[in-house]
Amino acid sequence: MMRMCWLVRQDNQHQRIKLPHLEAVMVGRGPETKIIDKKCSRQQVQLKAECNKGYVKVKQVGVNPTSIDSVIIGKDQEAKLQPGQVLHMVNELYPYIVEFEEEAESPGLETHRKRKRSGNSDSIERDAAQEAESSTGLEPGSDSSQCSVPLNKGKDAPTKKESLGHWSQGLKISMQDPKMQVYKDEQVVVIKDKYPKARYHWLVLPWASVSSLKAVTGEHLELLKHMHTVGEKMIADFAGSSKLRFRLGYHAIPSMSHVHLHVISQDFDSPCLKNKKHWNSFNTEYFLESQAVIEMVQHAGRVSVRDGMPELLKLPLRCHECQQLLPSIPQLKEHLRRHWPK
């Protein structure tokens, strides 16, 4: 019985790639992956399968960002890719998963294969999409316990217009969809986060094309102020009667290409809050306060993000109210109940 590992493109654009045990395999732009995007290096990642341990070591070799579950690995840095996680080759594009199989040869019989997956294919795509932060049709204040997402499969799956991105395209479409809009004016639109990490979780997006915080200049100062004002309006209009505390801010390294302001209640009462990366993205310096961003642009004309931000996502789980350390997400969630308003 021999264990094998395969790299599988989720949109089935090419045949799966074999990753031999402990053998370094370079993957990137080229005929094998059918990736022609020049932002993807020919040697974008180095993959080394640990077949006995059930994961793949991923080293980002290319300049542009490679991510696992929307967390950027970083140039010359390594991360583990496990079954159920999604590797985006570059710039949140070209999604891959890994599959482990046990192969046994029997005389006169075809090779018998058992595929090891973390859940079914639907759950894999659903978890991958969670980091995309696109919108949902839920009404403000409605039950956030439903974290399902309709899936595009087969010929209906988006394979063209790759410049928009596999997941970011969904966000831009949601901005334009009246059913998804909670509020809009001439400058911004507000949509409900598709995978809310708390009872209330909105995204405020400008109509103007601003790719990320790195693209923000002094010319965007009034827009940032307006986005903040609209975020406060959402709290007043839809959560004013609650005693919940809110924060407004941006992820230092967002998973989406279109800049967006998070407006999120501090209860973190949501089944979509599933792992340490989710928690730390909102409860460490990875989450940049909206007012702090405004002040940076006001004084320096740009937003500065310090090095080492991805490492913050790996920090131990710590309660944001009392600073107590918790060993797991379920225990953290149980602990948070004591801090909810009575």
Swiss-Prot record:
<feature type="modified residue" description="Phosphoserine">
    <location>
        <position position="123"/>
    </location>
</feature>
<comment type="subunit">
    <text>Interacts with single-strand break repair proteins XRCC1, XRCC4, ADPRT/PARP1 and p53/TP53. Interacts with NCL. Interacts (via FHA-like domain) with MDC1 (phosphorylated).</text>
</comment>
<keyword id="KW-0238">DNA-binding</keyword>
<keyword id="KW-0234">DNA repair</keyword>
<dbReference type="GO" id="GO:0003725">
    <property type="term" value="F:double-stranded RNA binding"/>
</dbReference>
<dbReference type="GO" id="GO:0003697">
    <property type="term" value="F:single-stranded DNA binding"/>
</dbReference>
<dbReference type="GO" id="GO:0005634">
    <property type="term" value="C:nucleus"/>
</dbReference>
<comment type="function">
    <text>DNA-binding protein involved in single-strand DNA break repair, double-strand DNA break repair and base excision repair. Resolves abortive DNA ligation intermediates formed either at base excision sites, or when DNA ligases attempt to repair non-ligatable breaks induced by reactive oxygen species. Catalyzes the release of adenylate groups covalently linked to 5'-phosphate termini, resulting in the production of 5'-phosphate termini that can be efficiently rejoined.</text>
</comment>
<keyword id="KW-0479">Metal-binding</keyword>
<feature type="short sequence motif" description="Nuclear localization signal">
    <location>
        <begin position="112"/>
        <end position="117"/>
    </location>
</feature>
<dbReference type="Pfam" id="PF16278">
    <property type="entry name" value="zf-C2HE"/>
</dbReference>
<keyword id="KW-0378">Hydrolase</keyword>
<feature type="compositionally biased region" description="Polar residues">
    <location>
        <begin position="132"/>
        <end position="149"/>
    </location>
</feature>
<dbReference type="Pfam" id="PF17913">
    <property type="entry name" value="FHA_2"/>
</dbReference>
<feature type="compositionally biased region" description="Basic and acidic residues">
    <location>
        <begin position="153"/>
        <end position="164"/>
    </location>
</feature>
<dbReference type="GO" id="GO:0033699">
    <property type="term" value="F:DNA 5'-adenosine monophosphate hydrolase activity"/>
</dbReference>
<feature type="zinc finger region" description="C2H2-type">
    <location>
        <begin position="317"/>
        <end position="339"/>
    </location>
</feature>
<feature type="region of interest" description="Interaction with DNA substrate">
    <location>
        <begin position="193"/>
        <end position="197"/>
    </location>
</feature>
<feature type="site" description="Interaction with DNA substrate">
    <location>
        <position position="277"/>
    </location>
</feature>
<dbReference type="GO" id="GO:0000012">
    <property type="term" value="P:single strand break repair"/>
</dbReference>
<dbReference type="GO" id="GO:0008270">
    <property type="term" value="F:zinc ion binding"/>
</dbReference>
<dbReference type="GO" id="GO:1990165">
    <property type="term" value="F:single-strand break-containing DNA binding"/>
</dbReference>
<dbReference type="GO" id="GO:0120108">
    <property type="term" value="F:DNA-3'-diphospho-5'-guanosine diphosphatase"/>
</dbReference>
<dbReference type="InterPro" id="IPR019808">
    <property type="entry name" value="Histidine_triad_CS"/>
</dbReference>
<keyword id="KW-0227">DNA damage</keyword>
<dbReference type="InterPro" id="IPR032566">
    <property type="entry name" value="Znf-C2HE"/>
</dbReference>
<dbReference type="Pfam" id="PF11969">
    <property type="entry name" value="DcpS_C"/>
</dbReference>
<dbReference type="InterPro" id="IPR047289">
    <property type="entry name" value="FHA_APTX"/>
</dbReference>
<keyword id="KW-0863">Zinc-finger</keyword>
<feature type="region of interest" description="Interaction with DNA substrate">
    <location>
        <begin position="255"/>
        <end position="256"/>
    </location>
</feature>
<keyword id="KW-0539">Nucleus</keyword>
<feature type="region of interest" description="Disordered">
    <location>
        <begin position="105"/>
        <end position="167"/>
    </location>
</feature>
<dbReference type="GO" id="GO:0005730">
    <property type="term" value="C:nucleolus"/>
</dbReference>
<keyword id="KW-0597">Phosphoprotein</keyword>
<dbReference type="GO" id="GO:0005654">
    <property type="term" value="C:nucleoplasm"/>
</dbReference>
<feature type="active site" description="Tele-AMP-histidine intermediate">
    <location>
        <position position="260"/>
    </location>
</feature>
<protein>
    <recommendedName>
        <fullName>Aprataxin</fullName>
        <ecNumber>3.6.1.71</ecNumber>
        <ecNumber>3.6.1.72</ecNumber>
    </recommendedName>
</protein>
<keyword id="KW-0862">Zinc</keyword>
<feature type="domain" description="HIT">
    <location>
        <begin position="168"/>
        <end position="273"/>
    </location>
</feature>
<dbReference type="InterPro" id="IPR041388">
    <property type="entry name" value="FHA_2"/>
</dbReference>
<feature type="site" description="Interaction with DNA substrate">
    <location>
        <position position="251"/>
    </location>
</feature>
<feature type="site" description="Interaction with DNA substrate">
    <location>
        <position position="174"/>
    </location>
</feature>
